[in-house]
Regions:
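Structured C-terminal cap/extension of enzyme domains
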Residues: 1, 169-270
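Residue-level recognition of short, structured coil/turn motifs
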Residues: 37, 96, 125, 152-153, ...
Length: 270
């Protein structure tokens, strides 16, 4: 929040949700809601291997005051379209708060067509946002918006991008309502967005161009890289990841990371 984040989303892909215990997940959601204290929205990640488990997490998140939910369809076994629609109905009904439909690639994600995303919003009461991260995501964002024109305005509240913010400028031109990157350079990500909203596109693009090398590394290494950046910034003490984890950084990666961060350091807020 000190870095200027407009909201907090936990625990999801960038926060290693897949290797957390059920109690750890609940602790993270509760702690975040308590610390945010209503200053920014908190969106609780409730993706699991089954609808039953996700419903349990959704109910918990709604009970303790989370502002919304985000979920990919269950990844234990691939669900049918009808099962996916039912999944989003049930987690929304359990939490009774707005739901982000996360469209993400395998193995953890399930790629959903734009028409399926719109169908979910039609049939699931609380599903009103999309987080789009599949292949050709920018064009998918545009197609979802086109198909969603049939919905009442209150049923489609917008799409957000992801993918470490690599396509943020293009996404903005396509009408997204935000982006959900990792937290390691949230001050820079938020600054780019704020500049765009202020009509200062040239400044936004200049900062974006400086951040792209790090965004590319983020996309390559995922949470291994996020944690390395957070440690180098003095925000966390340990950058270990749980097994199974991603590819570890080597000495060349660290040299490149140091070079990139030195150029971005003037833009840090914390």
């Amino acid at each position: 929040m000190k870095a200027g984040s407009h909201g907090i989303v936990v625990p999801v892909n960038a926060s290693e949700f897949i290797v957390l215990s059920d109690e750890e997940r609940k602790d993270i959601i509760r702690f975040t809601v308590e610390q945010a204290a209503g200053r920014v929205p908190v969106i609780a990640g409730v993706t699991t291997q089954s609808t039953y488990q996700s419903v349990e997490f959704a109910a918990y998140a709604g009970k303790i005051g989370a502002d919304g939910l985000i979920a990919m369809p269950p990844y234990g076994a691939r669900a049918t379209d009808d099962e996916i629609v039912e999944f989003y109905k049930r987690i929304g009904d359990a939490g009774r708060i707005p739901v982000f439909i996360q469209n993400y690639v395998p193995p953890v994600g399930t790629v959903m067509s734009p028409s399926l995303c719109v169908r979910i919003m039609q049939e699931a009461d609380y599903a009103s946002y999309i987080k789009e991260e599949t292949q050709y995501s920018s064009q998918v964002i545009t197609e979802i918006a086109r198909l969603a024109e049939i919905l009442p305005k209150e049923k489609y509240l917008g799409t957000m991008g992801g993918k470490a913010g690599r396509y943020l400028i293009d996404e903005y031109h396509r009408g997204v309502c935000g982006n959900m990157p990792a937290c390691d350079i949230v001050d820079i990500d938020a600054k780019i967005w704020n500049l765009l909203e202020e009509g200062k596109e040239k400044e936004a693009i200049a900062l974006y161009n400086q951040a792209i090398p790090l965004m590319n590394m983020e996309y390559m290494y995922g949470y291994v890289l996020y944690k390395a950046v957070l440690k180098k910034r003095g925000i966390i003490d340990c950058d270990s990841v749980r097994v199974p984890g991603g590819k570890r950084l080597d000495k060349f990666d660290y040299t490149e990371l140091d070079r990139i961060l030195k150029e971005l350091e003037p833009y840090y807020q914390v």
